[in-house]
């Protein structure tokens, strides 16, 4: 895998608050190598380490995108939901930004059945088929469609398991992370000072509570994916 320059700037990361960790009482001792200091009761992440792992992650997604691989971005906390959707849409990735439905990956056949149902209902709605049904039936199917749109809208074009999963918050998204580990799907995970750096394939030490921090990390990854995709399209 070729190493590239991704314009990862320490000053820019400081401005985004990437270096702010959790309180010193809420930490995982495994994160000690990634912590540079304590300040006013919170741990400070070593941004040199963050830059290194973010660069490795960018290299990985660029290489994968240049070979036509598929990505899934997961982040279901309310405040990060819009950033996750925006990043995924920009990079033409699949995403989950609401509740993670248990077994979404490990029980893929069930997810696939739900996706077929979702697509059928969307087609029925677009062609006016739902309006030709009795009111009670139409209302029930519209509620079903709304539910599927909420939870599966970001993966509606997914036809198989993703090749790489990007996880925004290890604590919040522990279930999808475990599903990826079970299936052997490579993961890139943003980890704060209370996380386990050994679980993901590439762990990026960063502030997972700050929107500006999350956006900066996602922006770098999205740029790398887009660059890789453009090369894949040119060579196709």
UniProtKB/Swiss-Prot annotation:
It comes from Guizotia abyssinica. Keywords: Chloroplast, Plastid, Ribonucleoprotein, Ribosomal protein. GO terms for molecular function: structural constituent of ribosome. Belongs to the universal ribosomal protein uS2 family. Gene3D superfamilies: Glucose-6-phosphate isomerase like protein, domain 1, Helix hairpin bin. This is Small ribosomal subunit protein uS2c. PANTHER family: 30S RIBOSOMAL PROTEIN S2 PROKARYOTIC AND ORGANELLAR, SMALL RIBOSOMAL SUBUNIT PROTEIN US2M. It holds the Pfam family Ribosomal_S2. GO terms for cellular component: chloroplast; mitochondrial small ribosomal subunit. InterPro entries: Ribosomal_uS2, Ribosomal_uS2_bac/mit/plastid, Ribosomal_uS2_CS, Ribosomal_uS2_flav_dom_sf. It is found in: Plastid, Chloroplast.
């Amino acid at each position: 895998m070729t190493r590239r320059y991704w314009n990862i700037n320490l000053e820019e990361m400081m401005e985004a608050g990437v270096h702010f960790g959790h309180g010193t009482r809420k930490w995982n001792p495994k994160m000690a190598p990634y912590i540079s200091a304590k300040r006013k009761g919170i741990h400070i992440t070593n941004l040199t380490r963050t830059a290194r792992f973010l660069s490795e992650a960018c290299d990985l997604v660029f290489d994968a995108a240049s070979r036509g691989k598929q990505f899934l971005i997961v982040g279901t906390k309310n405040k990060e939901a819009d950033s996750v959707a925006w990043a995924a849409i920009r990079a033409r990735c699949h995403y989950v930004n609401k509740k993670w439905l248990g077994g979404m990956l490990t029980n893929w056949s069930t997810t696939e059945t739900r996706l077929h149902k979702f697509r059928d209902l969307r087609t029925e709605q677009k062609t006016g088929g739902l309006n030709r049904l009795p009111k009670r039936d139409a209302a029930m199917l519209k509620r079903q469609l709304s539910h599927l749109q909420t939870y599966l809208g970001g993966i509606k074009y997914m036809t198989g398991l993703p090749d790489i999963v990007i996880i925004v918050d290890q604590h919040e998204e522990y279930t999808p992370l475990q599903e990826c580990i079970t299936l052997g799907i490579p993961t890139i995970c943003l980890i704060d000072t209370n996380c386990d750096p050994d679980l993901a394939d590439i762990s990026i030490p960063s502030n997972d509570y700050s929107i500006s921090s999350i956006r900066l990390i996602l922006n770098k990854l999205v740029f790398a994916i887009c660059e890789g995709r453009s090369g894949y399209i040119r060579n196709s």
